[in-house]
A protein has these predicted regions:
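Bacterial N-terminal signal peptides that target proteins for export
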Residues: 1-9
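Boundary at the C-terminal end of the N-terminal hydrophobic targeting segment
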Residues: 21-25
Length: 220
């Protein structure tokens, strides 16, 4: 265990071939992960779309969102306006970073990491709390190590109030109001190869989603 991170998204035919060749088997692997809900599976599929071709994802999925801003207000279709911290600035920055980012290894699902993520979801469903620290002082590392041994690098991403897999991933990528942009950096980090995901209702923010990411993981 060498590093810990605990922060609180040439030719077109050639690119499509690479995505289909590498991502499709991964999608099949995700679909076989019976411990994940349909929502959680779609979050992981969306994350791997980002990693398979960050530049293409930014062009097709993020650039259109620029039209949804009215000053600092952001309006998801069919939802009430959201007042952002930075307006378009964080989104412009995200697009610029992703257009320079080379494709990354796809993330494989981990049952042990998903169990660790679910510990925090279940607790915060009861308490209404937010953040990375549990009621009895637990943190991402202690929760993950209940279920096995992680390798290389470990990080936890959490979102609140996002009721679709697409919104979960996009909000983490944009990372509005987070100066470190660690949520985005985690998604675009080549060191991460496996992930656990847990999502559920939250008493104050309607929906929450927790991701535990590691370089590798061996369940107990």
């Amino acid at each position: 265990m060498s590093q810990r991170i605990f922060p609180i998204f040439f030719l077109i035919l050639f690119s499509l071939f690479i995505f289909n060749a590498k991502a499709q088997p991964n999608i099949q692997l995700i679909q076989r992960a019976t411990y994940l809900t349909a929502f959680e599976k779609q979050v992981l599929i969306e994350l791997n779309k980002v990693r398979a071709n960050p530049a293409q994802y930014a062009e097709e999925n993020l650039e259109p969102l620029l039209k949804a801003f009215d000053g600092r207000l952001f309006i998801w279709p069919g939802t009430i306006p959201i007042k952002t911290h930075e307006g378009k600035k964080a989104l412009f920055e995200c697009i610029r970073v992703m257009k320079k980012q080379k494709p990354l290894p796809l993330l494989s699902p981990s049952e042990g990491l998903s169990k660790a993520a679910n510990v925090l979801v279940k607790e915060q469903q009861k308490t209404g709390a937010i953040g990375h620290t549990g009621r009895r002082g637990s943190n991402p590392q202690t929760r993950v190590e209940q279920f096995g041994d992680w390798k290389g690098k470990l990080a936890e991403n959490i979102t609140y109030g996002n009721n679709s897999p697409f919104r979960v991933v996009v909000n983490l990528l944009i990372d509005d109001g987070v100066p470190s942009r660690n949520h985005r950096k985690n998604i675009l980090d080549t060191a991460f190869r496996t992930i656990g995901i847990a999502a559920g209702d939250h008493p104050k923010y309607t929906k929450m989603c927790v991701m535990e990411m590691a370089g590798g993981f061996q369940s107990k």
